[in-house]
């Protein structure tokens, strides 16, 4: 009997916290496979831990060691080895909720052979260190609940700024990812955006499970979403932005609503990058912000206008100190509401 769900767990010097993550996903039993990818760890016994789990759970866990290639290459490796009908990435410092996990497996199990959705969506929870309350990102105002639907059944205008489909949210049909040729770039952070974005034109049928499945941990100082870390790695974020622009222009989604959603996603990515460049405030970074928007304009004038002429697109491009002040204030308010770092 084939596996129902494949998990890829990218690990890099993750010995301190990876066991909690692994323990939550192996609880699915032999219906699932857990591919632990050690991405060339150098400072701890990450791979030894992965091998121990493989030995203890030979019908569930596969430990893979590779030369360091970055998060994206670890996801690529997980997908390469995946045999399950569905595919899910869980970062090694995150985990899945036990009760929601049972519900998710029951849902995936319920689909008739050959009639499975291309994408299954569930809620995620910000597990932020020191936060007084946990922020839950859910989608019942946007998606039909517990039923198959298409892009035509979605009102794209109902998406709130914190409701976009992220890696934490999605379970993809494995064959779709392999058929569309998804391959994430090496040695690049923030490729989770590419992982979600590039397969979207191939997604026809979707399904939303209104359960708080994924637990997204925020609090490590070296975490990629930490503000200072994001600014230090801004060139990688910009590289991801440009690839997403290119892939959108190269692969027409066909469906009008899918196209609208992808443009909105691109707009948010452009605005987030612009805000971090503004927060940094160096002459070099402010020039990089101009260069990013010029890249979009040079690639496609029509797409540029759709990205540029929105409220946030306008605010991050006001060419004065006032504009930068507005962007910084907006960032602080959004961070307090959403709590993303």
Task: Show which residues each predicted segment covers.
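Short aromatic/hydrophobic "clamp" motif used to bind/position activated sugar donors
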Residues: 87
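Membrane-interface aromatic/basic loop that binds lipid-linked glycans or pyrophosphate carriers
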Residues: 279-341
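Nucleotide-sugar-dependent glycosyltransferase catalytic core
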Residues: 188, 205-240, 280-287
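Glycine-rich, basic loop-to-helix element that forms the pyrophosphate-binding segment
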Residues: 66-82
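A conserved acidic beta->alpha catalytic loop
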Residues: 38-48, 70
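Short, well-formed alpha-helical segments that are part of the catalytic scaffolds
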Residues: 13-27
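Donor-binding/catalytic cores of nucleotide-activated saccharide
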Residues: 71, 95-206, 218, 222-230
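Cell-envelope/extracellular polymer assembly enzymes that use nucleotide-activated donors
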Residues: 3-6, 33, 194
């Amino acid at each position: 009997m084939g596996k129902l769900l494949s998990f890829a767990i990218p690990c890099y010097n993750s010995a301190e916290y990876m066991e909690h993550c692994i323990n939550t996903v192996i609880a699915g039993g032999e219906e699932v496979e857990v591919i632990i990818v050690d991405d060339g760890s150098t400072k701890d016994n990450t791979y030894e831990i992965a091998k121990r789990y493989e030995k203890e759970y030979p019908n569930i866990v596969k430990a893979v060691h590779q030369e360091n290639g970055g998060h994206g290459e670890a996801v690529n490796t997980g997908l390469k080895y995946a045999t399950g009908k569905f595919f899910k990435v869980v970062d090694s410092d995150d985990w899945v909720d036990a009760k929601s996990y049972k519900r998710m497996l029951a849902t995936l199990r319920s689909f008739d052979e050959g009639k499975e959705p291309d994408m299954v969506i569930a809620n995620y929870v910000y597990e932020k260190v020191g936060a007084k309350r946990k922020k839950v990102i859910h989608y019942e105002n946007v998606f039909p609940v517990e039923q198959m639907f298409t892009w035509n059944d979605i009102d794209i205008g109902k998406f709130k700024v914190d409701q976009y489909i992220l890696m934490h949210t999605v379970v993809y049909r494995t064959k779709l990812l392999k058929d569309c040729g998804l391959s994430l770039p090496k040695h690049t952070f923030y490729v989770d955006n590419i992982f979600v974005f590039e397969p979207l034109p191939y997604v026809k049928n979707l399904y939303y499970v209104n359960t708080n499945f994924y637990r997204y941990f925020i609090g490590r100082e070296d975490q990629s979403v930490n503000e200072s870390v994001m600014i230090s790695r801004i060139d990688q974020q910009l590289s991801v932005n440009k690839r997403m622009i290119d892939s959108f222009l190269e692969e027409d989604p066909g469906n009008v609503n899918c196209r609208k959603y992808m443009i909105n996603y691109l707009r948010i990515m452009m605005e987030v990058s612009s805000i971090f460049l503004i927060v940094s405030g160096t002459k070099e970074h402010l020039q990089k912000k101009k260069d990013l928007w010029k890249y979009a304009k040079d690639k496609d004038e029509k797409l540029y206008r759709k990205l540029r002429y929105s409220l946030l697109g306008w605010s991050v491009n006001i060419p004065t100190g006032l504009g930068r002040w507005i962007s910084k204030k907006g960032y602080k308010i959004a961070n307090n509401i959403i709590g993303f770092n």
